[in-house]
Amino acid sequence: MKYGNTNLPENVRAFLEEIIDDEELCDAFYSCDVEIYDEDWVKDLEENFRQEFEDLMGPGDSSYKNIKAFARDGTGALWVILDDELIGYIGTEGQCGIVSRNINEFMNIIAALKGVSLLFNFWDVDTLSSEEAFIDAYNESEEDDENDYSEVFDKFISKHGFTRDLKTIYEYIVKGLTVQPFFQVIATDDDYVDSASVLGLDGQEQLEALIDALKAAQN
């Protein structure tokens, strides 16, 4: 298996191998801000991860210690595995957080969005506060999307038995984002500040606001 010389979990290695071996599928994920690279890239990042992490987040203590990068986005941010299970994001502007409960749900989310950027279109409290708002945002994004990878992603979804149901995708997203304890970095240098959540550059306030909105919707 490719990526066999990396420290990534086997299920993550299997997805990376499938994607990197299929040019169309790799391009499709690239369009969604999930840039998959070869084993040498992963291995090099593993060897230099401490410095890479500090370059992105500054000096600090992470709430999760077992962090392994498996992809980048277009800004240079990292998609990572936390504790060999959770999927996290480490941004370039001081933000980080958990985005999915596992690699299967993460891959399902990306494939179901079909070329729509998860990061730029859906990570905000208003969009995620209800199923209806999320589905409206999805429909608007699909209309504006210039890249059509529907056929490629449909094949990927069918192969893995993933869902296309947007209500289920919404559930995957909000349950992933609201996993606790939060993935955050507490600054250990006075010249830096604590990390923000992926929902906004204000510490964890936006994430807590989302949790409150979801609880209110259930009452």
Annotate each predicted stretch with a short phrase.
Residues 1-92, 141, 145-219:
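A surface-exposed partner-binding patch
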Residues 88-129:
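Compact, glycine/acidic-enriched structural inserts
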Residues 125-141, 159:
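Hydrophobic alpha-helical interaction segments
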